[in-house]
């Protein structure tokens, strides 16, 4: 809190495009600043917007996904995808959605499905998943519609890489 107070004091005396209003500061301290208008201007400093996003995901999980059939998860992912794909790619609406649970529902929802239903994979399958997801990240980054699926490919690449790295560590310890 001391660092945040120092930041707001420095912000008050420094010329710049955006100065923090009282509601911006309350929003950061209350972890709901990503719900306020123009989130790009008020998410700094620190991870307050991310913690607010995690609280949103916890609420969505408890209200909509906890102990529910997998169809609820897929339906919520589809609704959130439709909302984002209906937005103007350069518009403020999409920018606001991306800072909230609607923008992160695809990787979060698939993470919940992965945790519930995924079976252990062998090393060769993990390697193929890792390479294909890296390839997908590059290819899907050039189009607005396919760009929506890039976070899912990043999550698949990350999880498969960590699992591969842990298997390499175990193999090295055996020798």
Predicted regions and their residues:
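Small-residue packing motifs within transmembrane alpha-helices
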Residues: 7, 100, 107, 129-132, ...
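Solvent-exposed interhelical
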Residues: 55-80, 112-129
